[in-house]
Amino acid sequence: MATSQADARDRQFLAVIGDEDSVTGLLLAGIGHVTAPPDSQKNFLVVDNKTDNAAIEAAFDRFTTERKDIGIVLINQHIADRIRHRVDTHTAAFPTVLEIPSKDHPYDPEKDSVLRRVRRLFGE
């Protein structure tokens, strides 16, 4: 699937799906964005133990398919595990999905879908 330069140029924002500490840190770093009314969509989702998987999947789908202004989706790896089937099936170049560690959950490269694809590509 070829991606046009115009499509890549329009993708100027980051999105984040993460725990409260990760999202807060990234918002303080300046990634926060809300689209113009009437929909006023945020580019982040704070996930806790009470957040159901359907809400996480809906945010992931919104950031990866509906929003054409998102270039990178950052997601805590332990949250990506909750919707692993969605993360693993996302193969588009834009937006790129990157799994990041959180304060309480260390990064495990064996679970990262991007690294697994790279290993498969190089025959490891």
UniProtKB/Swiss-Prot annotation:
Keyword field contains Transmembrane: no
GO molecular function ontology, one term from the record: proton-transporting ATPase activity, rotational mechanism
Classification via InterPro entries: ATPase_V1-cplx_f_g_su, ATPase_V1-cplx_fsu_euk, ATPase_V1_fsu_sf
Cell location: Vacuole membrane
Physiological role: Subunit of the V1 complex of vacuolar(H+)-ATPase (V-ATPase), a multisubunit enzyme composed of a peripheral complex (V1) that hydrolyzes ATP and a membrane integral complex (V0) that translocates protons. V-ATPase is responsible for acidifying and maintaining the pH of intracellular compartments.
NCBIfam families in UniProt: V_ATP_synt_F
Name by which UniProt lists this protein: V-type proton ATPase subunit F
Complex formation: V-ATPase is a heteromultimeric enzyme composed of a peripheral catalytic V1 complex (components A to H) attached to an integral membrane V0 proton pore complex (components: a, c, c', c'', d, e, f and VOA1).
Membrane topology: Peripheral membrane protein
Record-level GO cellular component terms: membrane; vacuolar proton-transporting V-type ATPase, V1 domain
Species, as recorded: Neurospora crassa (strain ATCC 24698 / 74-OR23-1A / CBS 708.71 / DSM 1257 / FGSC 987)
Lineage: Eukaryota, Fungi, Dikarya, Ascomycota, Pezizomycotina
Predominant cellular place of this UniProt entry's protein: membrane
Pfam families given in the database record: ATP-synt_F
Keywords (A to Z) from UniProt: Hydrogen ion transport, Ion transport, Membrane, Transport, Vacuole
Family (UniProt): Belongs to the V-ATPase F subunit family.
Record has Chaperone as a keyword: no
